[in-house]
């Protein structure tokens, strides 16, 4: 049941990883190791979970100073991967510690039409996507998820700059996974970049989507796309 849940329930795998971090912080390494082994077994493609499990195994015989505290020869051969995973770990913890104030919404959402039932805010600095529901009582934060953005960050200006656009956009369609390659995972939601304002400002480029991950990868590093916003497939 856990294996199926971890693979398909939005946010569950991250919640379990955070629980492991909390157990480590509380000094309960035995329980953290047990839960980490279970998560790593159920989601072998969740690379950060695998790294944390490896750290906990190593901690039984030596001091572990940081996430991904591996022998120097391994660290040198995988310096890029370790950097990405450490950054992913930091962003997930940061998003947990720096929660939005209850009841607050992005200023861009204040005047949304009642016809718009949901709105999405992306905070690239925290590698986080926030899903809001627009109801008769106002905007309500429903959930939030880890995401990856462009390799070069945000503020897209020209085609091929590997940046994620900064602005207000609408989702234009819903592309089923059956119509896409495995690279896009569970599906894709194209947005209307460039919008009218972008065009007036001379911005170029196209094909900016929210989409999932390839089947061999649970999550991508914080900055790993060509401009799209990428979520895990369950999310």
Describe these PLM feature segments:
Residues 57-105:
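Alpha-helical linker/edge segments of TPR/alpha-solenoid repeat scaffolds
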């Amino acid at each position: 049941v856990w294996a199926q849940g971890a693979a398909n329930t939005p946010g569950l795998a991250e919640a379990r990883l955070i629980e492991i971090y909390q157990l480590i912080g509380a000094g309960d390494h035995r329980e953290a190791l047990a839960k980490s082994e279970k998560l790593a077994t159920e989601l072998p493609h969740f690379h950060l979970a695998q790294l944390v499990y490896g750290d906990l195994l190593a901690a039984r015989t030596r001091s572990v100073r940081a996430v991904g505290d591996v022998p120097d020869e391994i660290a040198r051969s995988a310096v890029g991967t370790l950097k990405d995973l450490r950054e992913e770990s930091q962003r997930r913890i940061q998003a947990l510690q720096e929660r939005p104030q209850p009841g607050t919404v992005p200023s861009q959402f204040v005047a949304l039409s009642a016809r718009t039932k949901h709105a999405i805010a992306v905070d690239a600095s925290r590698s986080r996507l926030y899903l809001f529901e627009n109801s008769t009582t106002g905007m309500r934060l429903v959930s939030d998820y880890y995401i990856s953005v462009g390799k070069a960050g945000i503020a897209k200006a020209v085609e091929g700059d590997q940046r994620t656009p900064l602005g207000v956009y609408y989702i234009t369609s819903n592309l089923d996974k059956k119509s896409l390659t495995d690279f896009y995972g569970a599906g894709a939601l194209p947005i209307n970049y460039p919008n009218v304002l972008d065009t007036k400002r001379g911005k170029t480029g196209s094909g900016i989507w929210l989409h999932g991950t390839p089947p061999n990868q649970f999550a991508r590093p914080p900055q790993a796309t060509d401009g799209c916003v990428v979520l895990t497939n369950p999310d």
